[in-house]
Regions:
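...captures the hydrophobic TM-helix bundle architecture rather than a specific catalytic motif
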Residues: 1-246
Length: 246
C-alpha cells in the first residue's frame, strides 16, 4: 500500500486493528461456542467444496496453458493454486464459525487472498483493480469490526445467533454493510468487475464459491433480524437494483 500510495487501504487497516484492540482490551467476551453446524452452513460448505473443488482441478491445466500463451507474465502457478486452496479453507471456516470474532478472521482472509489473486499478473491494471477490491472489502471489514465492538460493549456477546436474536439495529446494520461489500452489491459492484483481469479460475471462484457467497451467507444469517425493518427493505432494494442494473 505504501509503495503504490494506496493510503485509504492503510487507514482502513489501522482503523480495524485499533477497533479490535480497543474491544479486546475493554470488553473481553469469551465466546460460548466457536462453531455452528446447521443446514445452512452445511449447504454452503457443500457448495464451496463441490464448485470450488472443480475450479481448483480445472485451474491446474488452465494455468499451464495460460502461461504458454502469456509468456510476458511471470509463472507463479504454485502461488496461484495455493491461494485458491487458502480461499476455500477460509470459506469453510467462515460458514462454520459460530461467533463474530472467528467469522471476522476468515472474512478478512478472503479479502486479502482476493487482493493477491486479482493482482496476479502485476500489470498496472491488475494492481489498480486489486487495490480497489481491497479497500472496498476493508470498508466492509471495518463495519464488521465495529459491529463486534458494539456487540461486545452493549450486548456482552459476540455470538452471531445471539446478536441476531436481540435484533440490535446498529450491529445488524454494520454487518449488513459488510455483507453488501463482500457480495459486490451496488455501489460496491465495481470491484468484482475489476476482478476479471485475473486468470479465469480466480474470478470463477470469487463469483461462485467464496467472496460473493460469503456476503450472501451473512445476509441470510441476518435476515431474521432484518425482516420487516427499514434495514431489511434497504438491503432488498439494493439487491434488486443490483440484479437489474448488473
Amino acid at each position: 500500500s505504501v509503495v503504490h500510495r494506496k493510503y485509504p487501504v492503510i487507514l482502513l487497516s489501522v482503523a480495524q486493528t485499533a477497533v479490535l484492540i480497543w474491544t479486546e482490551t475493554n470488553f473481553p467476551v469469551e465466546p460460548a461456542s466457536h462453531m455452528k453446524v446447521d443446514g445452512l452452513s452445511m449447504l454452503m460448505t457443500v457448495i464451496a467444496a463441490f464448485v470450488g473443488g472443480l475450479i481448483c482441478i480445472y485451474a491446474v491445466g488452465y494455468m499451464k496453458a495460460y502461461h504458454h500463451h502469456h509468456k510476458e507474465y511471470k509463472d507463479r502457478t504454485g502461488f496461484f493454486l495455493s491461494m485458491l486452496f487458502l480461499f476455500l479453507g477460509a470459506m469453510f471456516g467462515l460458514v462454520l464459525s459460530g461467533n463474530l470474532v472467528w467469522m471476522y478472521f476468515f472474512w478478512e482472509i478472503t479479502s486479502v487472498v482476493s487482493f493477491l489473486l486479482i493482482g496476479y499478473t502485476r500489470t498496472e491494471e491488475a494492481v489498480h483493480n486489486s487495490f480497489r477490491a481491497l479497500w472496498m472489502n476493508l470498508l466492509g471489514g471495518l463495519g464488521f469490526a465495529v459491529a463486534i465492538a458494539v456487540s461486545a460493549a452493549s450486548l456482552h456477546t459476540v455470538q452471531l445467533e445471539e446478536v441476531v436474536q436481540t435484533g440490535a439495529a446498529i450491529p445488524i446494520a454494520l454487518l449488513a454493510l459488510a455483507g453488501l461489500t463482500k457480495s459486490a452489491q451496488l455501489p460496491f459492484s465495481s470491484w468484482l468487475l475489476g476482478a476479471m483481469v485475473a486468470p479465469t479460475p480466480s474470478s470463477a471462484l470469487l463469483h461462485s464459491a467464496t467472496m460473493v457467497k460469503a456476503g450472501v451467507y451473512l445476509l441470510i444469517r441476518l435476515s431474521p433480524a432484518m425482516a420487516g425493518t427499514m434495514g431489511g427493505t434497504m438491503v432488498s432494494l439494493i439487491g434488486g437494483f443490483t440484479f437489474i442494473a448488473c
